[in-house]
Amino acid sequence: RGKFKEICERPDGSCRDFCLETEIHVGRCLNSRPCCLPLGHQPRIESTTPKKD
């Protein structure tokens, strides 16, 4: 595998310096920038929800 990209924990998220008002902060990218997910894609993420794999 080649170079490191700005990879978000969520596949449809995007890495930026700060999230827009229409986005939710969902995690961190490899370069420690926030990972932002546009609102409306899915319900608000609850930390109490167990993950199913």
Curated annotation (Swiss-Prot):
Signal peptide feature range: 1-2
S-S pairs: C8-C35, C15-C29, C19-C36
InterPro entries from the UniProt entry: Beta_defensin_dom
Chief location category: secreted
Keywords: Antibiotic, Antimicrobial, Defensin, Disulfide bond, Secreted, Signal
Subcellular location, record wording: Secreted
Gene Ontology CC terms: extracellular region
GO BP annotations, alphabetical order: defense response to bacterium; innate immune response
Function: Has antibacterial activity.
Stated family: Belongs to the beta-defensin family.
Protein name per its UniProtKB record: Beta-defensin 108B
